[in-house]
UniProtKB/Swiss-Prot annotation:
Active site residues per record: 146 (nucleophile), 148 (proton donor)
EC number: 3.1.3.99
Function description: IMP-specific 5'-nucleotidase involved in IMP (inositol monophosphate) degradation.
Catalysis performed (reactions): IMP + H2O = inosine + phosphate
Quaternary structure and partners: Homotetramer.
Keywords: ATP-binding, Hydrolase, Magnesium, Metal-binding, Nucleotide metabolism, Nucleotide-binding
Protein name: IMP-specific 5'-nucleotidase 1
A molecular-function term among this protein's GO annotations: IMP 5'-nucleotidase activity
Length: 422
């Protein structure tokens, strides 16, 4: 296996994004022409800045046209939409030149002679630009997080003393609403207390914070199906369920149970058929919940180690299952009457009713019922932003600003960029 193959394939962890790939192509030209020359780094820096300045202007133009289309019904098309048809909605201007300068100091992008600006370089630049934009606006009111691979490792939890704990508490102390929008779907609030125990314990132990500040922490479980809010008494702490009448939108209340059950039935049948077709181990299981169905790895006995070990489902099989189920449901009439989300969780596959766009939107309304928090005042941090199919954070792009991270360590890094200036 060649090194290039390994590098390109490993990028599938973040699934290629059309906007990032387009920027990557623009930056490749000055890199090829200038790298290795006597004045290469300086000239490359100037050309990169010029490119990012042009992209900045294209984003600003797109926002202006978005506003005209919304307010005046204009049919005008932005130049950026013509160049990158898959590009989504922008809610803030992006200071890309300033963000590039930040990341160039950290990653020495212009000093490299053999490796051109990569997918991850550009991802970090876009993250920095979004942070800078929110800081300049001074309007950030809601920060939402994915769970696995964002706040903690896949299948893990927030431990006592974890680095992420102090960062989230700082957000709460500064009056920012914080929501954990996770695919983990439990109707029992104690399950979320277990996953977020280190954070809950720290909140309970912090006597300098008011209960009002602490109650700004919520959990949206099953992407958009269960809402819980932090609470404490003199002896207890954890999460309490919020009554459906206080947060479930009327549009969601209109979904019929028959359509929901039929959609999950089809997904469940597909998982079963694909399990046989892809020759996956019989120990793998299909789990059916009230508003979700998943295909998860089981355990198999390792004769050499003499212990049960978790089955590893091949990445290709996970992606195949997601895309097949997604395509099947897109043409299934009952599924068109509701919202659903199919995604690859890294070691398993799920089909949920609802989606993270809906989950974030619900929190925007829950925190400010009379005047909902806007997309430009919202920041969602997650690790799954693939443009289609296998990533559930992607939908959150339509509900607010986003940061694309790849690990809990990166979550801490972006919060460290944000918090000192809030």
């Amino acid at each position: 296996m060649s090194s290039r193959y390994r590098v390109e394939y490993n990028l599938k962890v973040h699934k290629k994004d059309a906007f990032i790939e387009w920027i990557k192509g623009l930056l490749a030209v000055p890199f090829v022409l200038q790298a290795g020359t006597d004045s290469g780094a300086e000239r490359t820096y100037k050309q990169y800045c010029s490119i990012f300045s042009d992209i900045e202007n294209l984003v600003s133009q797109k926002i202006e046209i978005q506003n005209r289309r919304r307010q005046l019904g204009s049919l005008e098309e932005a130049r950026l939409d013509q160049l990158v048809p898959q590009v989504g909605t922008f809610f803030t201007h992006l200071p890309l030149v300033e963000a590039f300068e930040v990341q160039n100091r950290r990653r020495a992008i212009c000093s490299r002679k053999m490796v051109s600006p990569s997918f991850n370089d550009i991802r970090h630049i876009l993250n920095s630009a979004q942070i800078l934009a929110l800081l300049k606006s001074k309007e950030l009111k809601l920060v939402t997080f994915d769970g696995d691979v964002t706040l903690y490792e896949d299948g893990g939890s927030i431990e006592r003393g974890g680095k992420i704990v102090t960062r989230i508490i700082t957000l709460l102390k500064r009056g920012i609403n914080v929501g954990v929008v996770t695919a983990a779907g439990y109707d029992d609030p104690d399950k979320y207390k277990e996953r977020l125990y280190g954070l809950c314990f720290a909140l309970f132990s912090d006597k300098s914070m008011s209960l009002e500040q602490k109650s700004k922490l919520t959990v949206m479980g099953g992407e958009s199906n269960y809402l819980f809010q932090y609470f404490e008494t003199s002896e207890q702490f954890g999460f309490k369920s919020i009554d459906d009448d206080e947060w479930v939108p009327s549009s969601v209340k209109a979904w019929s149970d028959d359509d929901i059950d039929a959609t999950l039935d089809v997904a469940q049948t597909c998982f079963g058929e694909l399990s046989h077709l892809l020759a996956l181990p019989s120990k793998c299981q299909i789990i059916r919940k009230k508003r979700a169905v998943g295909f998860v790895p089981g355990f198999i006995f390792d004769d050499e180690l003499e212990v049960n070990v978790k089955i590893k489902i091949p990445r290709e099989a996970l992606e195949e299952m997601v895309l097949v189920v997604q395509k099947k449901l897109e043409s299934y009439p009952p599924a068109q009457n509701i919202q659903f989300s199919c995604f690859d969780g890294g070691s398993d596959v799920w089909c949920d009713i609802g989606g993270k766009d809906l989950g974030v939107s619900i929190l925007q309304n829950f925190y400010q019922t009379d005047s909902p928090i806007t997309a430009a005042q919202t920041l969602h941090i997650g690790d799954q932003f693939a443009p289609k199919g296998s990533a559930n954070d992607f939908k959150a792009r339509s509900a607010g600003c986003t940061l694309w991270i790849s690990s809990p360590r990166e979550t801490i890094e972006v919060l460290d960029d944000l918090l000192p200036y809030l």
